[in-house]
Amino acid sequence: MTAEEIKELDAQVRKARFVLSQKAGALHDLIEDRLPADYLEIPAYAEDTFLACKAWDELNKKLTENKI
């Protein structure tokens, strides 16, 4: 990868990390503020958080492999 491509990938990793943090925060807020009343919403929030983590992990691995 070129230096420019690595820079772009790094930006994508940072953006994915931000999205991951937002999803995790929403799950945390659900647990802290709305349980047990809204317990049926847990699977959707958990799935969103899982997918955000997976997206970040894939991008981060690609970045790590190409930075070397």
Protein language model regions, located:
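Short, charge-rich amphipathic interface segments used for partner binding and complex assembly
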Residues: 25, 29-68
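N-terminal acidic leader/helix
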Residues: 1-31, 61
